[in-house]
Amino acid sequence: MSIEPLKKQDGRLLRAQRTYDDVHKKLIDSAVELFNNPLISPDKISVSQVAKHAGVSVATAYNHFPENKLDIYGSLFQLGFKDVADELNAFLETAPEPSAAIKMFLDTIANKVVELGNAIRIAWFEVRDIQASGKWIQGEPYDVLKSLCKNYDSESADDLADDIFQLFNGCTFLWLRYDPSYPVWSKYTDEWYVENVNEIFEKATKIQK
């Protein structure tokens, strides 16, 4: 059997996958823009509307999101964390100090969360359904954090990772509840969130002492 036809077939498959991935990202970017538009109610946003906004056919959009908006929410987390992982891996190639890697990981997640804005707020409150449907992130962020903590202090890695995880989720919950019209929740702005996440590592290491 000649190997050349296989190479051509592999090339076609790679191009098809690249096209699929490009369209998928275009659709997700469209969804993020719509969810962050204050003039549009999130409940009114549909797969069809996302497709129209992206300049993609509705049939193509449903090929990417067969289970409606649940697929969109899952993709927001998946693509968002992929971006974080790519940035972290590039940073790790520079052989940083273990503490710098942990801080960079947390800061990168926080910046990605802020970048996605209301889209991630809306998706977060569907997280149970996302997990149950198998559309959650491939590679749990906590596992990445724990691995980074082991590089920092192998003996107390579990406790350090747990403390960081709790502090991070506390900040994230408050940011998720941000509401400019309500005094209590109005202070948990994007700036507040990024600043407080940046302080988590120092707070967690103090708890360990």
Task: Spell out what each predicted region is.
Residues 19-32, 50, 72, 76-84, ...:
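Generic hydrophobic, amphipathic alpha-helix propensity
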Residues 23, 76-80, 84, 105, ...:
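Hydrophobic/aromatic residues within well-ordered alpha-helical segments
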Residues 26, 34, 38-71, 75:
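Helix-turn-helix
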Residues 88-115, 164:
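Hydrophobic alpha-helical connector segments
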Residues 121-125, 150-199, 208-209:
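Hydrophobic/aromatic-rich alpha-helical bundle segments in the mid-to-C-terminal region
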